[in-house]
Swiss-Prot record:
Protein name: Ephrin type-A receptor 7
Molecular function terms, GO-annotated: ATP binding; axon guidance receptor activity; chemorepellent activity; ephrin receptor binding; GPI-linked ephrin receptor activity; growth factor binding; protein tyrosine kinase activity; transmembrane-ephrin receptor activity
Gene (name only): EPHA7
Domain Fibronectin type-III: 331-441, 442-537
Sites of Phosphotyrosine modification: 608, 614, 791, 940
Domain Eph LBD stretches: 32-210
C-alpha cells in the first residue's frame, strides 16, 4: 500500500512502541463491565473499513509476545478524505450509559513535508443504535456523532528517531441507550492515526455485604448525576431492624454511597464479620436488639446452639414478668421465729424474714387460718368473718393482727413467704405454723336500748343481752351524762338485770345514756348513744316558797344545806365501799340485784386503797390477796435476790387446776416486823390490780415460813436487760406493741388512782409472748435533801433520770409525773436498753432538764414516737398527755404502720438534743479525721475518705444507711458514730440559730 511504501519506518516504529508500551495498559477496574476490548482480541478484529483502502488492520506483539490487533490510517497526501472504520455489533446488556476509551497516536502534520493543505490532526467518533446486526454496509447517515477527537500530544519524525511515542487516551460517554446494541464508527478526514486500542464498557456497583445486608450488582443510572437506590437483603439468620430497612445508593461512577439502615442478627445468633453465627451451648440471645450472646443466667442452661432463652434448672423458675437475663429463682423458705400474742379473741403474729428468699426481692407473706378440733385431729379453713389487719395476703411487713376469732377455740395459723415464682412451683409449701387457743372474749355490744318511762327526775331503761355474750354476764354498766357536758363528767349505774331506773336527774334536761356488759373477760363496747329529755317541772310554787323563806331566814338555808351535804357524803363513802366490793375487791360474792350509783370525774369503777391506811397489815393483805397453802407451791430454783430475800421460780398447783409457772418472793430469815410489813405491803397493792399488762398476784403465804408472795412467772425478765440482750432484733411495730402494753397497764393504774412513782424499764417484766407488764409496787420511797436528788429505799438508791422535774423539786407525784417516766421508758425501749442521759451526773441531768434540753431520738426511732416522748416531757404537767391518750396514739400507729416509717426531722416542734458538758464541741474540729479521733473511731478514717466525706458538713447530713454503706458492720460502732453525728448536727443548728429548746 502507498502508506506502507511511502512511510514504512513509521509503521515499524509504531510496532516497537506497541511492544514497549503495551505493559502500561491499566488493569480492568473492579466497577467496570467490558463490552469490547480490542487488546484482548488475539485474532483479527475484522472490523468494516470503508473505503477498503482507508483504515488498515495490523498486528503486533506485546511484551509477552501476545498478538495485538490495531488499525491505522495515514491518507494525508490527498484532500477530502472520508475513511470510515466500524466495529462489529456490540450488545449493551443491562447498560444505560456506555463509556468508550480510545488509545491512539497521531502524527504532527508539521512533521510531514508537503501535506500542509491536506493533513488533519483530528478524527470523529460516531455510534449507531440497533437491536441486531445490520450487516457489513455502513449507512453513514444513520450514525450519530459522539465527538471530534483531537490528540493532546502528536509525535514527529524526531520522536521516531528517538524511539519516543506519545500515546493519547480519550474517554467519551454514550447514552442513555434504548436499543439492545450499537456500533461504533471512526471517521478519518485526513489524519495520520494509529488506533492502539478501543475499549467499550459500562459501570456498575459490585455486590457487597454491608451491615449484614447483601446488596447485589447494580448498574449505574442513565444520567451522570443519577443515584440508584438499592434495598439490601439480610444475610442468613438476620432480620431488618425495625423501621430501618437496609438501603444503599449506587452512584454514576459505580460506587456505593453511605449505607442507610441495617440488618441485625436474629434471637439466638450473633454477628461475626458479615455473617450471623448461632450462640453456643450455655449461651443465649433473647432478642435481635442484643448485640452479643450472653452466658446463661444462674440456675439456667441451654443445651443446643442458637438458643433464644435458657431453660431453668429443676426446682427453679422464671416468672412471666421476669426478663430472660435474670437468674432463675425458687420460692422462699419458710418464715423464721414466728411468735404470737393472744389478747382474748385477737391474735397478733410476728415473724422474721425467711433465711432464703429464693433469689428474689419481691417476697410477701400470706396467712392461712384454720380452726381445729384437736380431739378429732381435723382442721377446716376459717370463715370469711375473720378480720386481718392490715390484710391476709400480699403482706409486705412481717406482722399481722387476726381479729374476730371465736372465744375458747383452737386455731392454727400458717404463715407462708411467697415470691413471684411461688405459684409456678410444684413443690410442697413451706410455712411456719403456730397453734393457739383463744381466751374468753369480752361481750359484744348491747343492743335494743329503749326508754320505758320518763319522769321529771328519773328515767327507766331496758335493753337486750349482747348477741355474743362470750361468757356469763355478771353485770351491766349504764353511763349517763348531761348532753351539754359532752362527757366531761359522767355517772355510772350498775345492775345485773336488763333494765334499770336512773334517779336523781334534773328536770327539763337532755341526758345521754350508754350501756355495756361485763364478763370475766372485761367490759364490752358501749351501746349507741340514747338521748332522753326529762320532763319539765310541773309548777314553780315550790321554788317560789323556797325563795321567800330564803330571803326571810338565810341561816336556815345554810343549816339545811350543811345537813344535806353531810348525809350525801355519808352515802358516797358507803357507796364507795359497797361498789369496791361489788367490783371484785372482796373475796365474798354479793347477794341480790341491788343497783349502785357512783359519780366520778374520770372513767373506771375501781379505786386504789393505800394499805398504809390499815393499822393491821395482815388485815390489808387478806383483804386484797388470796392466802395459799404452802403445799401447793414447789420451789425449783433461785433466780435472783430481792430487797427482802431470794426470788425463786417454781410451780403452783391449786386443787382442780393445772399447775402454772410462778415467781416466788421469799422473806429472809430474821426479818423485823417493819420488814414483814413492807414485804406484805407490795402484795396488798398488787392484789388490787387485775389487768393483762400488770403483773398478776397469785396469792401469799403468811401462815407459814418462809413468808411468800407468789406472782405470775415472766420468762424474759426485766425489760431493760431483755432489750440489751436482743439489741436490734425487733421490728419497730414490735417495740411499739411493747410500749402499748406498758401504756395500757399504766392507764389502768391511773384510772384506779394509783401513782407508780418508779416507772422504768427495769420495773417492766416481759413474758414469753413479749407481753410487757408493770411491776415493782412495794418500794417505800422518801426523797431526801440530797444534791444528787435520788430516791432512798431500803434496797438502794434509784436515779432521778426517770423522775419528773416537779417530783424532784416539790415532791409532787401524780399520774402526770408517771407520764414523764413513761416517756423515759419509751426512750429506753427504742434505744434497746441504753442508760438515759448516758454517763452524765444526776446534777447535770437536772440542770439540763431545767434549761429545756431533752433526750434526742434514738437511732432509727420514727419521728412520731420521738414527738410523743417530747410530749411526755413537757415542763408543765398539765400539758402532758394522759395515759388514755397515749394508748390511743399508739393504737393508731399500730393500725397504720406507715406512720412509723416517717423519717426523723418531720416533727412539728424542733428541739435541741440534750448535750453533755463533757461532750466535745464538734464545730471546733477542722477535719473529719480529728472528729473520728475524738470519738475513738479513727479506724474508719479511710472509709469516710474513700466515700467522699471530706468535710464535717457532709458528715452532719449522713443517715444510718450512709454509715452502714461505709462497711461499718459493728452495731455498737454504728450507734456511736450516728449518735455523735446527731450531736454534731444539733451543735451546728444551734450555732446557726436554728435549734430551740422545749
Amino acid at each position: 500500500m502507498v502508506f506502507q511504501t511511502r512511510y514504512p519506518s513509521w509503521i515499524i516504529l509504531c510496532y516497537i512502541w506497541l511492544l514497549r508500551f503495551a505493559h502500561t495498559g491499566e488493569a480492568q477496574a473492579a466497577k467496570e463491565v467490558l463490552l469490547l476490548d480490542s487488546k484482548a482480541q488475539q485474532t483479527e478484529l475484522e472490523w468494516i473499513s470503508s473505503p477498503p483502502n482507508g483504515w488498515e488492520e495490523i498486528s503486533g506483539l506485546d511484551e509477552n509476545y501476545t498478538p495485538i490487533r490495531t488499525y491505522q490510517v495515514c491518507q494525508v497526501m490527498e484532500p477530502n478524505q472520508n475513511n470510515w472504520l466500524r466495529t462489529n455489533w456490540i450488545s449493551k446488556g443491562n447498560a444505560q450509559r456506555i463509556f468508550v476509551e480510545l488509545k491512539f497516536t497521531l502524527r504532527d502534520c508539521n512533521s510531514l513535508p508537503g501535506v500542509l493543505g491536506t493533513c488533519k490532526e483530528t478524527f470523529n467518533l460516531y455510534y449507531y443504535e440497533t437491536d441486531y446486526d445490520t450487516g457489513r454496509n455502513i449507512r453513514e447517515n444513520l450514525y450519530v456523532k459522539i465527538d471530534t477527537i483531537a490528540a493532546d500530544e502528536s509525535f514527529t519524525q524526531g520522536d521516531l528517531g528517538e524511539r519516543k511515542m506519545k500515546l493519547n487516551t480519550e474517554v467519551r460517554e454514550i447514552g442513555p441507550l434504548s436499543k439492545k446494541g450499537f456500533y461504533l464508527a471512526f471517521q478519518d478526514v485526513g489524519a495520520c492515526i494509529a488506533l492502539v486500542s478501543v475499549k467499550v464498557y459500562y459501570k456498575k456497583c459490585w455486590s457487597i455485604i454491608e451491615n449484614l445486608a447483601i446488596f447485589p450488582d447494580t448498574v449505574t443510572g442513565s444520567e451522570f448525576s443519577s443515584l440508584v437506590e438499592v434495598r439490601g437483603t439480610c444475610v442468613s439468620s438476620a432480620e431488618e431492624e425495625a423501621e430501618n430497612a437496609p438501603r444503599m445508593h449506587c452512584s454514576a461512577e459505580g460506587e456505593w454511597l453511605v449505607p442507610i439502615g441495617k440488618c441485625i442478627c436474629k434471637a439466638g445468633y450473633q454477628q461475626k464479620g458479615d455473617t450471623c453465627e448461632p450462640c453456643g451451648r450455655g449461651f443465649y440471645k433473647s432478642s435481635s436488639q442484643d448485640l452479643q450472646c450472653s452466658r446463661c443466667p444462674t440456675h439456667s442452661f441451654s443445651d443446643k446452639e442458637g438458643s433464644s432463652r435458657c431453660e431453668c434448672e429443676d426446682g427453679y423458675y422464671r416468672a412471666p414478668s421476669d426478663p430472660p437475663y435474670v437468674a432463675c429463682t425458687r420460692p422462699p423458705s419458710a418464715p423464721q421465729n414466728l411468735i404470737f400474742n393472744i389478747n382474748q379473741t385477737t391474735v397478733s403474729l410476728e415473724w422474721s424474714p425467711p433465711a432464703d428468699n429464693g433469689g428474689r426481692n419481691d417476697v410477701t407473706y400470706r396467712i392461712l387460718c384454720k380452726r381445729c378440733s384437736w380431739e378429732q385431729g381435723e382442721c377446716v379453713p376459717c370463715g370469711s368473718n375473720i378480720g386481718y389487719m392490715p390484710q391476709q395476703t400480699g403482706l409486705e411487713d412481717n406482722y399481722v393482727t387476726v381479729m374476730d376469732l371465736l372465744a375458747h377455740a383452737n386455731y392454727t395459723f400458717e404463715v407462708e413467704a411467697v415470691n413471684g415464682v411461688s405459684d409456678l412451683s410444684r413443690s410442697q409449701r413451706l410455712f411456719a405454723a403456730v397453734s393457739i387457743t383463744t381466751g374468753q372474749a369480752a361481750p359484744s355490744q348491747v343492743s335494743g336500748v329503749m326508754k320505758e318511762r320518763v319522769l321529771q327526775r328519773s328515767v327507766e331503761l331496758s335493753w337486750q343481752e349482747p348477741e355474743h355474750p362470750n361468757g356469763v354476764i355478771t353485770e351491766y354498766e349504764i353511763k349517763y351524762y348531761e348532753k351539754d357536758q359532752r362527757e366531761r363528767t359522767y355517772s355510772t349505774v350498775k345492775t345485773k338485770s336488763t333494765s334499770a331506773s336512773i334517779n336523781n336527774l334534773k328536770p327539763g334536761t337532755v341526758y345521754v345514756f350508754q350501756i355495756r356488759a361485763f364478763t370475766a373477760a372485761g367490759y364490752g363496747n358501749y351501746s349507741p348513744r340514747l338521748d332522753v329529755a326529762t320532763l319539765e317541772e310541773a309548777t314553780g310554787k315550790m321554788f317560789e316558797a323556797t325563795a321567800v323563806s330564803s330571803e326571810q331566814n338565810p341561816v336556815i338555808i345554810i343549816a339545811v344545806v350543811a345537813v344535806a351535804g353531810t348525809i350525801i357524803l355519808v352515802f358516797m363513802v358507803f357507796g364507795f365501799i359497797i361498789g369496791r366490793r361489788h367490783c371484785g375487791y372482796s373475796k365474798a360474792d354479793q347477794e341480790g340485784d341491788e343497783e349502785l350509783y357512783f359519780h366520778f370525774k374520770f372513767p373506771g369503777t375501781k379505786t386504789y386503797i393505800d394499805p398504809e391506811t390499815y393499822e393491821d397489815p395482815n388485815r390489808a393483805v387478806h383483804q386484797f390477796a388470796k392466802e395459799l397453802d404452802a403445799s401447793c407451791i414447789k420451789i425449783e430454783r433461785v433466780i435472783g435476790a430481792g430487797e427482802f430475800g431470794e426470788v425463786c421460780s417454781g410451780r403452783l398447783k391449786l386443787p382442780g387446776k393445772r399447775d402454772v409457772a410462778v415467781a416466788i418472793k421469799t422473806l429472809k430469815v430474821g426479818y423485823t416486823e417493819k420488814q414483814r410489813r413492807d414485804f406484805l405491803c407490795e402484795a396488798s397493792i398488787m392484789g388490787q390490780f387485775d389487768h393483762p399488762n400488770v403483773v398478776h398476784l397469785e396469792g401469799v403465804v403468811t401462815r407459814g415460813k418462809p413468808v411468800m408472795i407468789v406472782i405470775e412467772f415472766m420468762e424474759n425478765g426485766a425489760l431493760d436487760a431483755f432489750l440489751r440482750k436482743h439489741d436490734g432484733q425487733f421490728t419497730v411495730i414490735q417495740l411499739v406493741g411493747m410500749l402499748r402494753g406498758i401504756a395500757a397497764g399504766m392507764r389502768y393504774l391511773a384510772d384506779m388512782g394509783y401513782v407508780h412513782r418508779d416507772l422504768a424499764a427495769r420495773n417492766i417484766l416481759v413474758n414469753s409472748n413479749l407481753v410487757c407488764k408493770v411491776s415493782d409496787f412495794g418500794l417505800s420511797r422518801v426523797i431526801e435533801d440530797d444534791p444528787e436528788a435520788v430516791y432512798t429505799t431500803t434496797g438502794g438508791k434509784i436515779p432521778v433520770r426517770w423522775t419528773a422535774p416537779e417530783a424532784i423539786q416539790y415532791r409532787k407525784f401524780t399520774s402526770a409525773s408517771d407520764v414523764w417516766s413513761y416517756g423515759i421508758v419509751m426512750w429506753e425501749v427504742m434505744s434497746y436498753g441504753e442508760r438515759p442521759y448516758w454517763d452524765m451526773s444526776n446534777q447535770d441531768v437536772i440542770k439540763a432538764i431545767e434549761e429545756g434540753y431533752r433526750l434526742p431520738a434514738p437511732m432509727d426511732c420514727p419521728a412520731g414516737l420521738h414527738q410523743l416522748m417530747l410530749d411526755c416531757w413537757q415542763k408543765e404537767r398539765a400539758e402532758r398527755p394522759k395515759f388514755e391518750q397515749i394508748v390511743g396514739i399508739l393504737d393508731k400507729m399500730i393500725r397504720n404502720p406507715n406512720s412509723l416509717k416517717t423519717p426523723l426531722g418531720t416533727c412539728s416542734r424542733p428541739i435541741s438534743p440534750l448535750l453533755d458538758q463533757n461532750t466535745p464541741d464538734f464545730t471546733t474540729f477542722c477535719s473529719v479525721g480529728e472528729w473520728l479521733q475524738a470519738i475513738k473511731m479513727e479506724r474508719y478514717k479511710d472509709n469516710f475518705t474513700a466515700a467522699g466525706y471530706n468535710s464535717l458538713e457532709s458528715v452532719a447530713r449522713m443517715t444510718i444507711e450512709d454509715v452502714m454503706s461505709l462497711g461499718i458492720t459493728l452495731v455498737g460502732h454504728q450507734k456511736k458514730i450516728m449518735s455523735s453525728i446527731q450531736t454534731m448536727r444539733a451543735q451546728m443548728l444551734h450555732l446557726h440559730g436554728t435549734g430551740i429548746q422545749v
